[in-house]
Structures are given as structure tokens and as C-alpha cells.
């Protein structure tokens, strides 16, 4: 985690890069939770959530059913292509036929997470959740390409961290948060 902070160090002050890191950690957490939940729903169909083709009629039917259940159970929804791991792969150039420029899509996804909660019990919890993550800030880089490169580095670093969501005894996300807060406080 501290490597991620070091990637942003010197570009902005600690309070600012803390907002980006914690925002991306939360996006990763929401994505992993969504992916695990959708995978459980799809077990009887023998497919994984990331395998659902969003461009087919059957894929749309899956997404609609999963969306309804996810909003009820989790309070938010992400499409397979909006998952953190998929964006990290795409940004890193690991997705065949896809452009590795992800900034615009990432902004849209973070907005979509918040908007997916409209009219649900979780709406207030998600309102302006990612507002402190200004992906257009020149502090991330002078050019769009430089901003994209920096954000991709952060996503790729974070993608390698396993939050152990399957282990309800561990609070890895909470531990990561406390670790970062301690590091920011100490200097």
C-alpha cells in the first residue's frame, strides 16, 4: 500500500493523495464484493460474472436479474466491465482489442456506482462518495496521457492486493485503512 502512496508523493500533499488511495481501495472493495455476489448467483448457470457478455440479449437478461438482486442485497451495482480488476487489466494493456486509456471510463464508472443507488435505501450512503477523487486534476499529470499512466499504476498496484473478502473474520480493508491513516499521520 505504501508503494501506491509513494507513486503519488511529490505530485500532491498527503491529504490529497490519501483521498485518491482510499477512494480506489473502496472502489476495489465494492467491485470484489459485487463480483463475488454475482458469481454466487451465476453458479447454477455455470458461468462467472466477468464472462457475461453485456452486448448480447442473454447477457442483458443476466445483468438485469443480477442488478435487481445486487441493489436489494448490496445497495449498488457494477457491470462486469466496470469491475476494478477489469479496469486495471484494460489500463495495463492486458485486454485484447481495448484502448488502455481509461480515465473517462473510470470517471463514468465512479458516477455509475453512485447513480445505481438512486431510489434505494443506500442512496444517502453513496451520495458524493467519490467526489474527492478529481481525475481531471493537473496534480495527477500535465497531460491526459500522464494522468492515465499514473492512475493505471495505482490501479495495478492495488489489483495485486487480496482483501480476503471471503474471510469474514479478517477486516483487511479496515486494516489497510488504519495502516494508511497511521502512515499519513506519521509523516
Where do the language-model regions lie?
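Non-catalytic, mostly N-terminal accessory regions of nucleic-acid modification and defense proteins
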Residues: 1-187
Amino acid at each position: 500500500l505504501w508503494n501506491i502512496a509513494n507513486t503519488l508523493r511529490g505530485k500532491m500533499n498527503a491529504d490529497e493523495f490519501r483521498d485518491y488511495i482510499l477512494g480506489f481501495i473502496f472502489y476495489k472493495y465494492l467491485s470484489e464484493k459485487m463480483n463475488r455476489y454475482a458469481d454466487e448467483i451465476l453458479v447454477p448457470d455455470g458461468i462467472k460474472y466477468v464472462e457475461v457478455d453485456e452486448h448480447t440479449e442473454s447477457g442483458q437478461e443476466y445483468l438485469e436479474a443480477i442488478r435487481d438482486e445486487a441493489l436489494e442485497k448490496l445497495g449498488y451495482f457494477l457491470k462486469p466491465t466496470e469491475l476494478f480488476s477489469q479496469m486495471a487489466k484494460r489500463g495495463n494493456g492486458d485486454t485484447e482489442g481495448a484502448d488502455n486509456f481509461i480515465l473517462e471510463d473510470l470517471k463514468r464508472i465512479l458516477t455509475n456506482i453512485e447513480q445505481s443507488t438512486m431510489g434505494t435505501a443506500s442512496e444517502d450512503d453513496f451520495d458524493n462518495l467519490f467526489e474527492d477523487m478529481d481525475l481531471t486534476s493537473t496534480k495527477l499529470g500535465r497531460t491526459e496521457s500522464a494522468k492515465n499512466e499514473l492512475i493505471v499504476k495505482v490501479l495495478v498496484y492495488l489489483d495485486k492486493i487480496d482483501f480476503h473478502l471471503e474471510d469474514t473474520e479478517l477486516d483487511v480493508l479496515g486494516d489497510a485503512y488504519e495502516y494508511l491513516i497511521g502512515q499519513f499521520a506519521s509523516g
